[in-house]
Amino acid sequence: MVFHRLSRLGSRIVKELPRERHLSMCGKRILQRSYGQYLQSSPMLQRQTRSFKEALFSNNHKFCTSFSTTSEKGGEKTEKINVTFVDKDGEEIHIKVPVGMNILEAAHENDIELEGACEGSLACSTCHVIVMDTKYYNKLEEPTDEENDMLDLAFGLTATSRLGCQVIAKPELDGVRLAIPSATRNFAVDGFVPKPH
């Protein structure tokens, strides 16, 4: 019940936010004044609502959020890094990747043959890439246990192997070179290459 009311509150806040480029809202008064009507309940639910209000508006808890609606289309450019993919034939493909995007998405947007059968849900190893320079590999966050479990299934595993869906572009990775292994374990035997999702 409390979750339902909180989700209604959240969706109402989002709907009523002004169409500005950036907005920050902090403090309990905003919620009490503008959105208190959504926290009111019928007499049957009064006790639960009171507990919810106390938890939400107590002095120990504060509500604070901010968001930005800026985009590249709005005139502001997104920071990009240079990434080089080296395919199985040794051909180099240079692309620019927006900071914050994962390597699998970047490959798909640039028609680079990196499968990603599970669409980045850590359920396969088909987006396996090899970071060609340990200097860049050391700048990456440590792989999670889930990623390591999937990497154990990857074809041609190396000490600098990662899943493309888990490598997020950040400024310190500018210039990284990634090798795409010659095969993955999910490709069909007849050579059929599935289209990116």
Swiss-Prot record:
Cofactor needs: [2Fe-2S] cluster
Keyword line: 2Fe-2S, Electron transport, Iron, Iron-sulfur, Metal-binding, Mitochondrion, Transit peptide, Transport
Taxonomic superkingdom: Eukaryota
SUPFAM superfamilies documented for this protein: 2Fe-2S ferredoxin-like (SSF54292)
GO cellular component: cytosol; mitochondrion
Main localization (coarse): mitochondrion
Subcellular location: Mitochondrion
Ranges where the 2Fe-2S ferredoxin-type domain occurs: 81-184
Any Pfam family the entry gives: Fer2
GO BP, one annotated term: P450-containing electron transport chain
Gene Ontology MF terms: 2 iron, 2 sulfur cluster binding; metal ion binding
Residue sites binding [2Fe-2S] cluster per the record: 118, 124, 127, 165
Co-factor note (free text): Binds 1 [2Fe-2S] cluster.
UniProt cross-references to InterPro entries, sorted A to Z: 2Fe-2S_ferredoxin-like_sf, 2Fe-2S_ferredoxin-type, Adrenodoxin-like, Adrenodoxin_Fe-S_BS, Beta-grasp_dom_sf
Residues of the transit peptide: 1-74
Protein family per UniProt: Belongs to the adrenodoxin/putidaredoxin family.
PANTHER family: ADRENODOXIN-LIKE PROTEIN 1, MITOCHONDRIAL-RELATED, FERREDOXIN/ADRENODOXIN
Summary of the function given for this chain in its UniProt record: Associates with the adrenodoxin reductase MFDR to form an efficient low potential electron transfer chain that is able to reduce cytochrome C.
Protein name, per record: Adrenodoxin-like protein 2, mitochondrial
Gene expressing this chain: MFDX2
